[in-house]
Amino acid sequence: MDLRRLTQNTGCRLLRGDALTEITSVCCDSRCAGPGALFVCLPGRHADGHDFAAQAVAAGAAAVLCTHDVPGLPAGCAVLLAGDPRRAMAALAARLYGEPARAMTMIGVTGTKGKTTTAHLLAAVLQADGRRVGLVGTNGVCWPGHRHDLNHTTPESCDLQLLLRRMVDDGCDTCVMEVSSLGLKFDRAAEIEFAVGVFTNLSPDHIGPDEHADFAEYLFWKRALFRRCRVGVFNNDDPHVGKIMQGLSCRAVTYGIGCPADVRADADFALTRAGGRLGAAFTVDGARYAVGMPGAFSVYNALAALTAARVLGAGEDAIHAGLAGAVVCGRVEPVPLDAPFTVVIDYAHNEAAAECLLRTLRAYRPTRLVAVFGCGGARSRLRRFGMGSVCARLADFCIITEDNSRGEPVEHILADIRAGLRLGNPATPFAEIPDRRQAIYYALDRAQPGDIIAILGKGHETTIERGGIKEPFVEREIVEEYWGR
């Protein structure tokens, strides 16, 4: 598509170059630029895309979109100006790739906890209902026969629109997508209208210099999803649901356990354990449902998926089958071992998620509840204090270690976690083992019959980042290999 057609009514202005320049792709990473690419210069806190424009052109980019002119670009390179490059990038990518979101039923899931599990449960239900479903989120992007890792829960708009195009071309009619607050703030999901939006819950998270300024801003961006939905599905038990729903024009459908709701589960849900798999069973309108994940929060996630599925017209048989059969990598994921104790791997990496998980595991009455965890480098220090505090309060023994330290010294991170441990319960015993692999070995070597070992923070991730270098690190494999040696 040429620049003239591509930029029509987008607010972009051609500063110089040929309006008939053909564009075949849109990117914001100069390393991904190639012949026919439109490179979008995104300003950022730590790096400015304008500084990489020449590199993108050298790689073959046919045009550059900027907020201001970039000196030194070759004469043959077309240069576009836009006041809001993120909005412009979303509009241009959607147009170039043929507005793929319009060809599918789009479902967005947002909230502090439960996005990934709810999205996977809903996708499983819709697949059981006969739909061809794509899934985008923290665990990557997948559709039948395809799977790719992602750098963000919600990818940059140029990447997202291309992925949606590939889904449509491969026959997908539905897409379930986790929509993060940062994805909304940075317009990664712009140009997408959602048939259904799902709100799971809200608690303080992603607050810091590189994320949200405060909780009010975090809430603002969470509710932004529902300004682009035809139907909103809301957790009516969440204390912030009133603020999330305030002033919205979409049709609202609520779910819950404690408060009156359109879809309400009985409060007498049961914990289940079969074949080493922890689960729960609950009742809605006299019908019994099972979900293969433990605890109250799994009931809430299943209720969210059930409610959204009903809004979308899924059959009851599909709802039962999808909820019972779904497995989510890195979400209270059991590691099958021939051992008298249980090991679960979970992505819980903030105070709220860790508290929900540990309280749930406590309900299974373990001999000891052992938490193995760290916190990421170059992220909010408040998260470290919170993780340390909640684990000290709810675990019987803590093993603190690294978790994607990035460029920050591990000892600095561990010092913050230790401060959190003292705040939570200074009497809780703990071990400090900076190497995460050795920390896992330590937990396994000292496990007692009836223990539950919860390895927190990385979940589905397949690498660990140290000093800017990512190394292979799959916790399920580490546990299985060490125990089976």
Predicted segments, located by residue:
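Nucleotide phosphate-binding/pyrophosphate-handling subdomain across enzymes
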Residues: 32, 275-277, 282-397, 419
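C-terminal helical cap/extension that packs against the catalytic core
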Residues: 5, 9, 64, 68-76, ...
